Amino acid sequence: MRFFSYLGLLLAGLVSLQGFSTDNPLEEELRYWCQYVKNCRFCWACQDGLCKNKVLKDMPSVQEHSYPMEHCMIHRQCKYIRDGPIFQAECTMQTCDATHLINA
């Protein structure tokens, strides 16, 4: 019986997940998301064709519209549960693989 109670709570949390896309996170949450999912669109500030990571200042700039930048912007989708203990990133690539592409 306890299992079904836990499962119900988990499913309720997943339903709430649908409304919280990290395309435009709250300012106080930006550091968390840019640290663990470095290549999502909201982590980058682009100007004059170059994109710089908003939080990790020591990361090299990336050309806007380069393969790594376009791939990350189009294909990576990161979501989370705002008021729960579960943080989840749904991405087509693992973060370390995408970081490797950007640093290549």
Swiss-Prot record:
Annotated InterPro entries: ASFV_fam_110 (IPR004848)
Pfam family, one: v110
Induction: Expressed in the early phase of the viral replicative cycle.
UniProt keyword Signal present: yes
Keywords: Early protein, Signal
Signal peptide start-end: 1-31
The family this protein is said to belong to: Belongs to the asfivirus MGF 110 family.
Role summary: Plays a role in virus cell tropism, and may be required for efficient virus replication in macrophages.
Annotated protein name in UniProt: Protein MGF 110-2L
